Amino acid sequence: MSKEPDRLFAQPLPQVPDFAFNEDVVRVFPDMIKRSVPGYPAIVENLGVLAAQFAQPDTVLYDLGCSLGAVTQALRRHVRSDGCEVIAIDNSTAMVERCREYLNAQNSMFQELLPVQVIEGDILALAFKPASVVALNFTLQFVAPEQRLALLGRIRGALVPGGALILSEKLRFNDEQEHALLTDLHIAFKRANGYSDLEIAQKRSAIENVMKPDSLEEHRQRLLAAGFSKVVPWFQCLNFASLIALP
């Protein structure tokens, strides 16, 4: 993947636009997410490991909001179930084009990988096939809050017995002191990764109108309301977490 450093918010902007997954973001996305999301590499690689435990023969593995395909690549590295395929979908043209390039490169380096389709489209309009693994890796937080339950219900309806949804999200906290502490620690993480206070502030202004995090309890209750039987947190680093939801 590209090693271009993220300097998108390094200079003062007269007006900070809403964050969008456009060509500028795609160009620096690997650097951006690694320096912004604590534990991201561990989540992605272990998502592949977890998926291998839930994948069922002759089913689909979905990567919803696939961005550059890091999760898709992890699924293909770890899952060996017969007859499975990966369907990766994103609504950003720039992301989809670059994702296809990266997956073609993966094809040239490895043999016996799962077949994959990369689709440009809206996950809210997706016609789900029978699935054993669905990954929502930092995607649900960009879906309008009033549309989240319906999406999760459709995912639950597509999951076969023994399958799982793996949901990774930034969290907010209902306790003000806890929320303030973990927010400050996240800022410290970004500073330690080379972001200036200006970059942090401008990125926050850009993203706060388009990303709406939920609390862990809100996720749990929504997943249960969508028909999942069990919700198990398996990873948390600061205010970022990943959950396994079982049908």
UniProtKB/Swiss-Prot annotation:
It catalyses: prephenate + S-adenosyl-L-methionine = carboxy-S-adenosyl-L-methionine + 3-phenylpyruvate + H2O. It holds the Pfam family Methyltransf_25. S-adenosyl-L-methionine binds at residues 40, 65-67, 90-91, 122-123, 137, 204. It is an enzyme of class 2 (transferase). The keyword S-adenosyl-L-methionine applies. Its EC number is 2.1.3.-. GO terms for molecular function: carboxyl- or carbamoyltransferase activity; S-adenosyl-L-methionine binding. InterPro entries: CmoA (IPR005271), Methyltransf_25 (IPR041698), SAM-dependent_MTases_sf (IPR029063). GO terms for biological process: tRNA wobble uridine modification. Keywords: S-adenosyl-L-methionine, Transferase. Belongs to the class I-like SAM-binding methyltransferase superfamily. Cx-SAM synthase family. Homodimer. Catalyzes the conversion of S-adenosyl-L-methionine (SAM) to carboxy-S-adenosyl-L-methionine (Cx-SAM). This is Carboxy-S-adenosyl-L-methionine synthase.
